[in-house]
Structures are given as C-alpha cells and as structure tokens.
From Swiss-Prot:
Membrane topology: Single-pass membrane protein
Primary role: Atypical kinase involved in the biosynthesis of coenzyme Q, also named ubiquinone, an essential lipid-soluble electron transporter for aerobic cellular respiration. Its substrate specificity is still unclear: may act as a protein kinase that mediates phosphorylation of COQ3. According to other reports, acts as a small molecule kinase, possibly a lipid kinase that phosphorylates a prenyl lipid in the ubiquinone biosynthesis pathway, as suggested by its ability to bind coenzyme Q lipid intermediates. However, the small molecule kinase activity was not confirmed by another publication.
Organism of derivation: Mus musculus (Mouse)
Protein name: Atypical kinase COQ8A, mitochondrial
EC class: transferase
Disordered as annotated region, ranges: 99-134, 179-200
C-alpha cells in the first residue's frame, strides 16, 4: 500500500510540474504575465504542499520506498527541464548544422542509426553511427537515464531505429516551427523498417518440408473455397464494373488470400518471388483485393530466427565474421523473397547493409515453382495460358541467377561505374570483405521506396519518373545490360540529397546487339504509329510467325502501338490518366488463346521492366513529354551503330 502511494506521489508531482509548464506557456502565449503568472505558480506550490501533508504519514512509515520514489522523481525532474518561455536561451536551433557539443555523448549511442549512411552521397551531419534530428541539435535532455543498468555494466543495448535527438524547453513558437518542419518532406529523415506484420519463422530447408507447406495450402484453399461458395458471397465485378483477369475464381476469398500470403511468406524463395511479380501489376490485370494482399508479400517476407541466420553467416563468412564489425543488428530491417537485410557497423565506423540469403532457397527453385503453379492451377486462380511452360522455364533460369550474390555484386559494381557521374542516380558501394555466394554487403543508404513518394510535389515526381524512363532506354540501347526487376523498393529516393539509389541487381541481364537492333526499330515504328512497320519487325523478331489469325495479329499490333503512345506525341503524356494497362488488359485473352509461338525469351524480363517503369509513372501520376527522350536514344543508337561498322 505504501509503495502504491509513493508511486502516486511521484505521479502527482509530475503532473503538477507538467501543469505548471503548460499554464505558463499558455499565459505567455496569450500575453498574460506578471501577477497571473505568479498566481499560477503559487497555486501549483500550494497544491504540492497540501498533497504532501495528506500523505506525510505514509511517507514516514516507509522511508525506503519514499526516498526511492523521491530520488527517481528528482532524477526525472532534473532531466526533463521544463524551462519557462521567459527563461534565457530556451529557443530551439532548427539548423541541421547545430554544434555537436549539444548532442548526446557517444557513450550513449546504442548501435548504428539505420536511417542514414555514414558515407557516400547520403551522409548526414552528426557523429558516426548517430541519427541527425530533422530539427537539428537542441538544448536540454528528455528522459535520458545516465544510470542505465545496461550501460553501467558495460553492455551496449540495441535500440532499433531510435531517435537520439534531445529536446529542451519549448515555446509555442518552437512547437509551430517543429510542426512546419515535420510537414516538409525535404526536412524529414527517412528510415527503412521491417513490416510490422513480418514474423520470425524458420525457413523450411528440405524439399519435403517445403512440399508439406504447399500441401497444407492446397487443403486450406479447398476448404476456404467451399466455405465461400456456401456463403454465396463471391463478387466477380469490381466497383467500376470492370472484370479483372484474376477475379473469376471461387478460391479467391479473403481467407484464402491470407492463406496464400502466409504460406509464401513462410517458404519464401521462388514461390514468394512469383507472388511479388503479381503484386506490381495494375488493378486491371489482378483482383484489387488480391493485389493489396500481395502488396504485403512485396513489402516484407517473414524473417529467419537468430540461430538459423547465424548458422548461414558462419557457413559463408567463417566463424569469425563478427571480428570485422563493431556492431551487428540481429533483427533485420528488410526481408524479401530470397534474403533478409541487417544493419551493421564496421570497425572504422562505416555503416553497411548485409543481405543474407535464406538457406535452401537456391536448391528448391524448380520444386517451389512447380508446387506453387500446381496449387494455383488446381484452384483456377490464373487464366489458362497466363504462365505457359516457356515462361515458367525462363523464370526458373532467372531465379537461379538471382540466387548468386557474387554475380549480383559484379553487376552492382558495373552499374556503379556506368552511373558514377550521373547527377540523379546512385549505386551503393559493394563491401567485398563481407560478400560471399550467399551474403551481399553494401554501404547503407537512406531514403524511402517510390511507392511512398506519392506525397512529393508534382515537379519532383515528374523528375523521378522522367529519369527512370531515360535510364530504361539507356540500359537497353546504350549499356546493353538492364536491371530487369521494377519492384518499387529497388528505387530509394532521398529527399535531402535529391537522389535515387538503385538497389538489387540480381535480376540483371545483358542484351545482344542483334536483339536491340530489331527491337529499337519496333519502338521506332510504334512511336510513328506505323502499323505495317510494326508487323514487319514483329515477324523478324519472331513475335509472330505471319500465320496468326487476324484477331491475334490485330491484338499484338494494338498492344505494341498502345505502348508506343507515350513516345508518339510531343505534348506532355499524362501517366496518371492514361488507360494503357486497361487497353492491354482487354487484349490479353485474345493473345493467350491464339498465340502460335512464345515471344523471344529476352522480352519477358524486358517487358517486365518497361511495364513496371510505366506503372511507377502511373502510380506517381507523372506528366511530361516522352517523344524527345526516345528520339535522343534512337539518334544515339544509330550513331553508335554506324561508328561500329
């Protein structure tokens, strides 16, 4: 009882102090000072005295508890420092370049500040491994316990994505400035964090273990479909009356969608990669509800337990890999289809991101793809012909290459060299000493993925999207090597540096000039809206045999010409209002039914990248002219080709 009352005293005193600070701030803001301010202080002091008298006996009965509570409250009171508005030196410094002597001592840094890179173009002001407040360094400290038991015993606590900025006495004007600073995207630091829905679950390594998960999914989908039919609640039309390609299966209930996501996030690997590919499709192609479910798949998979993750690192980097690091965050800040990413700080203070591949993923690609396709086909979730055997074979080969982190590191270095002088794009540096076939380490960058960029200004969104489309054309027609994964999380925008970091080069592939020589002529004909030229070049490229029925020929030509619309007009192309995806969606059933031969293998990844880039422009509602960018790419290509001859 005494302990409870002691706590009550501490809370009441704290509330009294808070009330005093609030009253004084409001009186000062209203221009009412002098006697009213003194009266408020007198009332507060009287209240504290009366409260102490009431509980005096209780305090006397248990001096130990009282002294403990008082001691803790005095420590708290000393560190909160509620300065009055009229006190000298209470104004906040909102400059990002505030003096370092106002920051926290380095001894209280609890691991790296994952929001920022300590090197490279995204370096922030402040101590190494320490986050910089968007409001700059300020006077005073807020709830900093210098007698932390962990620190007293020499143990470095981990605090994930902590903000180490400090706050002093606040005036009404300071609060308003802080609100305005928070509202400005340019002044806000950005951090990448693991999805709150991600769970720690062991990756099933053996094929039998993975097969068991797919078997459980198949049974669950069947039960869910029966329940859905029994409820008679299927809706095959969305709110606009437009029917989506994947919106025709009784297996596609909410419960079944969750079953799919849960299984994919657990097994990860090739099956999850296929789900992520579906997540970046337009609503015209995929059921909007399923698209939202797969969005969770795209943002974050589940992550490995510590024991499984450590075993992978010991196997790949050797048992002494920690000797190269000053700090390693055991909880990942990102998890995807093939691996998860951890924060670390090297001995010299450099912050890095370590991507660790899930065990068993590379060895189970074929079985995973077969198992997932069997489940989806059994449940009739995909239209017939959407993933023909030829495409499945291409996906298997691409996923096998993506599991080779040494290959990815080589392509990252290649792109870093190609774009070293680019004013807008940046490729993080590879840290070779912490790389292996299953571990890839790069410098840490800051920013946010492009699916979170919708709140940026129209001008900034236009610039981002314009540069992405120009890069696509340069990759194909100038570099002849392209990063073909258009996942939004592979583009990180940093508003402080006004740069986009390019990530994940596992899906990179090269294109022969024999292919690009013909393909650029197809785009040229589409930009000119020349139907006959598109048909001729499509037959040359073996998109068509020349013996297709008229419906198939027209559908193919219409699809190519629709894609060429953006490059056809000198006027700004409004990606936000265009109906490109809907038009192509309407052509898909015809092409699936009447196609005689599969398209060239190179076009699967190429069109995935081009289509994904257009979708980014659409999501960000970009608006800018595209004809000039293609004309420049075409002229440069022809000039380069003539120089080689």
């Amino acid at each position: 009882m005494a302990a409870m009352l002691g706590d009550a005293i501490m809370v009441a005193k704290g509330l009294a102090k808070l009330t005093q600070a609030a009253v004084e701030t409001h009186l000062q803001n209203l221009g009412l000072g002098g006697e009213l301010l003194l009266a408020a202080r007198a009332l507060q002091s009287t209240a504290v005295e009366q409260f102490s008298m009431v509980f005096g006996k209780v305090q006397g009965q248990d001096k130990h508890e009282d002294s403990y509570a008082t001691e803790n409250f005095e420590d708290l009171e000393a560190e909160v420092q509620f300065s009055t508005p009229q006190a000298a030196g209470t104004s906040l410094d909102f400059s990002a370049a505030s003096s370092l002597d106002q920051s926290l001592s380095p001894s209280h840094s609890q691991g790296p500040a994952p929001a920022y890179a300590s090197s490279g173009p995204f370096r922030e002001a402040g101590l190494p491994g320490q986050a910089t407040s968007p409001m700059g360094r300020v006077n005073g400290r807020l709830f900093v316990d210098h007698r932390d038991l962990f620190l007293a015993n020499g143990i470095q606590r981990r605090s994930f994505h902590q903000d180490q900025s400090s706050v002093g006495g606040l005036t009404a004007e300071d609060i308003e400035k802080a609100r305005q600073a928070k509202a400005r995207p340019e002044s806000k630091p950005h951090k990448q964090m693991l999805s709150e829905r991600a769970r720690e679950r062991k990756v099933p390594v053996t094929r039998i273990g993975r097969l068991a998960n797919f078997g459980g999914l198949a049974v669950g989908l069947g039960i869910g479909a029966l329940a859905e039919v029994a409820k008679k609640s299927l809706r095959s039309e969305n709110s606009t009356g437009k029917k989506a390609v994947l919106d025709s299966s009784p297996f596609l209930s909410e419960a079944n969608a969750e079953r799919i996501v849960s299984t994919l996030c657990k097994v990860r690997g090739a099956a999850l990669k296929l789900g992520q590919m579906l997540s970046i499709q337009d609503d015209a192609f995929i059921n909007p509800h399923l698209a939202k479910i797969f969005e969770r798949v795209r943002q974050s998979a589940d992550f490995m337990p510590l024991k499984q993750m450590t075993k992978t690192l010991n196997s790949d980097l050797g048992p002494h890999w920690r000797d190269k690091l000053e700090y390693f965050e055991e909880r990942p800040f990102a998890a995807a289809s093939i691996g998860q990413v951890h924060l670390a700080r090297m001995k010299g203070g450099r912050e890095v991101a370590m991507k660790i591949q899930y065990p068993g993923v590379a060895q189970s690609i074929n079985s995973d793809v077969n198992n997932l396709m069997a489940v989806l086909n059994m449940s009739n979730m995909l239209p017939e012909g959407l993933f023909p055997e030829h495409l499945i074979d291409v996906l298997r080969r691409e996923l096998t290459l993506e599991c080779d982190y040494q290959r990815e590191a080589a392509y990252a270095k290649k792109f870093r060299e190609l774009l070293k002088d680019h004013p807008f794009f940046y490729v993080p540096e590879i840290v070779d000493e912490l790389c292996s076939p299953h571990v890839l380490t790069t410098e840490l960058i800051s920013g946010f993925p492009l699916d979170q960029a919708e709140g940026l200004s129209q001008e900034v969104r236009n610039e981002i999207c314009y540069n992405i489309l120009v890069l696509c054309l340069r990759e194909l027609f100038e570099f002849h090597v392209m990063q073909t994964d258009p996942n939004w999380s592979n583009f990180f925008y940093d508003p402080q540096q006004h740069k986009v970091a390019l990530l994940d080069f596992g899906a990179t592939r090269e294109y022969d000039r024999s292919f690009t020589d013909l393909y650029i002529q197809v785009i040229r004909a589409a930009a000119d809206q020349d139907r006959e030229a598109v048909l001729k070049k499509s037959i040359e490229m073996k998109f068509l045999t020349g013996y297709e029925v008229k419906a198939m020929e027209d559908a193919h030509l219409d699809a190519i010409l629709i894609l060429g619309e953006a490059f056809a007009s000198e006027e700004p192309f409004d990606f936000g209002t265009q109906s490109t995806t809907e038009k192509i969606h309407n052509l898909i059933p015809v092409m699936l039914k009447h196609r005689l031969i599969p398209p060239p293998e190179e076009t699967y990844s190429l069109h995935r990248k081009m289509g994904g880039s257009f979708l980014i422009c659409s999501k960000l509602k970009a608006r800018f002219p595209c004809k000039a960018m293609f004309e420049e790419a075409y002229s440069n290509y022809c000039r380069m080709k003539s120089g080689l001859q």
